Amino acid sequence: MLFPSPPTTAGYTVEDWLKLPTTGERIELIDGSFIASPMPAYVHAIATSRLVGALDDALPRSLEVVAAGNVAVGDDGLIPDIVIGHAEAMLKGPVALSASDVVCVAEVVSPGKVNRDRDYTIKPPKYAAAGIPVFIRVDLEGGDAPRVEIFNLGEQGYELVAEAKAGTVLTLDQPFPVSFDPAVLTGPRSR
């Protein structure tokens, strides 16, 4: 897909991002540039789907959870793998949620150096700066995979409050209580 030149030297805007046609790619707006990614690998999609299920089972009525939702984060347009937001805002049917309507985002780390950097060092500080209270990161690589980390927003950005690897139970208190073993995110179904 070809994009026209940005209207200013500052790059594209969230408004430009929201005008993009629907494609089979995830297109995010990061620091004024469009970043296109193919749809994730099946193991990534399965882990995302299973985490959405675990979270959805515990949600209070005031919240909703979706996979791969558009979120306007300051001057960026990001697509977290999972978005938990206020039901009232989400059910209005917006194309993108304002960060103020989001209580938690999750990223399932994609393979490759550029993708890992984006999920570890680029996107989390942007979510924190926008005031999103909880960030969840799921890493599917390494000997202890899957590993899930939970971060709560502190004064200096996100602070790690819990982590667990496959075979141990992870318990979250915020934004709502939920417990699960990260092992359920990958591998054969348990039911």
Show where each model-derived region lies:
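Gly/Pro/Ser/Thr-rich low-complexity, intrinsically disordered segments predominantly at protein N-termini
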Residues: 1-191
